[in-house]
Amino acid sequence: MKKFKKKPYIFLSSILLSQSALSVDINSSIGSAGSDGESGKTNMSTSTGQAGTTGQRGSNGGRGQGTTVDTYGHPGGDPSSGQQGYADGTGGNGGNGGNGGEGGGANTPFTGRPAGNGGRGGNGGNGGDSTASALGGPGGNGGNGGDGGLGGWSTVAASIAGRGGDGGNGGKGGNGANGSDGTSGKDGAKGGNGFDLTPEMEGDSFIIQGSVSGGMGGYGGAGANGLNGTKGGAGGNGGRGGESRNYAENSGGNGGNGGNGGNGGNGGNGGNGGNGGVGGDGIIVSKNNVQITNLSTVVGGNGGSGGVAGSAGLAGAGGKGGNGGDVPIGSPTTRGKRGEDGAFGENGINGRVGNGGAGGTAINISADGVILLNQGKVLGGTPGSINAQPGEAIVVSGKNSHIINDIGGEIWSSGLNSKAVEYEAGADNGIFEMRTNSIVDGVVDATKISNSKLVLGGNTAKENSTFIASKIGNGRQYQGFSNYEVNTSEGSTWNLIGETTALTPWTVTEGTLAIVSDHSLGSTDGALTLNGGVLQTVLNVNSDRRFNLTAESLNGGILTDGDLTLTNVISGVGGLKKTGNATLILGGQNDYTGRTIISSGNLFLTGEGGIEHSESVELSKGTSLNISSTTGGTMVNNLTGDEGSHVVLGDRFLTVNSLADSVFSGEFGAEGE
């Protein structure tokens, strides 16, 4: 466990200069807020484009020449459609159709022959479409159809007068323009950092006594509104049917059909709101090999809110259909049909509200060899919206870091999908240590790094703390650690409760690790290493995992308040010290080489179990070594025992290899003797 050296400190709370220390005041340091994003621009040009040119009126039909009895007047000429309106303008109206030509006279001496019929009126021109890209006008109106020509005349009273010409059809109204889409708002800027601990700063120890906060991210710009679609042009009216004339009665012409109205333009889509800016970091550490003690509160900046969405433009109305053409009074002919109204355009789609900015990181460690002792509160920034990423409390990208959440220390994520501590790829050899009465709210993620370690620590005597093993593993609170250690002060205990199937190779270096079940130690593929610390069994425990003894001193060992049965091998250069009144049962062919000390309780060897590689076996008063259940007896080295100790043989043989000065003052006997 790393200890702080006595070096000059930098107190981040008040200005103080001396020969041995440098202090800097960053009390209540808050990073500057990020700039707000610009709102989207609405294309609101009010200039109107030139209207489309109105189509010219159709030529009147020529008068019929009385050269034959069945000559008809020529139809009126159809005009050209109105020209398309320019951008931002109004579509041109269609030209009116020309009137039908007058019917030719029946220039004949024969009675009963018909005079010529009047010519058909010309069709009205179609209205021009409006194709405005921003503030367009409606489509042009269709031209009216030309009237039908008069029926022809006859020089003979008994002849039949010519029929009036049909009226021309009205032109179709031009389509309205689609409204322009609103532009999206700009994203807000990232908030400023609260404090940067840079390589240029003097000192290698820093104490944070004043609160530090990252700046808030800028607000996203508002999206612009979409423009409304424009109205379609009205259809042209149908031409009036021509009248018959001369001495005899005959029918007039049919009325022309009204033109259909133009379709309305679609509304423009609203612009999306800009995204909010990311909150600034509270503290950025880019100076290698520094020690930081946090006594206050460090908070990441809040994310900026997303911009407001632009509203959709409304659909343009369709143009009205043109009226049908009239017929002469008293004529049995048909009035023209009214044109159909144009269809409404479609409404635009509302824009999307901008996403809020992610919350800022409270402490961002990019340097190597950083030790962070947290006795205050570390909290990630709040996101700018529900769907935005909350800020992490601590992010580590530098190697060889050691984060200690000390007594009273708190590390808080700021919401779902946020992490209390995130080790980024490459931040290898990271250590995360928690101590009694500390709080970690959120995931501690070491899945991206190698040789990571989770430590249950402490530096106060006779602490009694609890850790829940089921919090370890994929999808759990503590993820991706490759090593696990108990390294607290002597006399203090960490109680490991609950179960996990994760691979958790525990090492007990100092202090006591207490269990009620072997399942608390994780998969049996992970060995338990006693490196000077104590494993305590509170209840009876059976285990098939390997044990390693690495400490040459015998301050640690196994404390059996409940019987402990080990069926696998105990290895290593260290010794085994057994305390507690319950029994330690060994069934493996153990090959550890250190001393075996039975200070209290019983050591029971069974099956092929043996301790023949152990340097010595030492029994205290009231303890026993029992080999009665071994397969064929066993061997021990340098057996010693106090008066009142026992070796229980049963019907097995015990071979003792002892030095001349080894003294056994206890008793040998069969089981029960």
Name every feature range the model reports, one short phrase each:
Residues 267, 347-348, 356, 495, ...:
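Extracytoplasmic loops and strand-loop junctions of Gram-negative outer membrane beta-barrel proteins
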Residues 7, 22-410, 419-424:
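Glycine-centric low-complexity repeats
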Residues 27-28, 32-39, 203-212, 290-295, ...:
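GD-rich hexapeptide-repeat beta-solenoids
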Residues 382-385, 389, 394, 413-421, ...:
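Surface-exposed loop/turn positions within long extracellular repeat scaffolds
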Residues 1-23:
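Gram-negative bacterial Sec-dependent N-terminal signal peptides
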Residues 206, 210, 287-290, 296, ...:
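Small-residue (G/S/T/A) turn/hinge positions that recur once per unit in extracellular repeat modules
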Residues 482-487:
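Outer-membrane translocation/initiation segment of Type V secreted surface proteins
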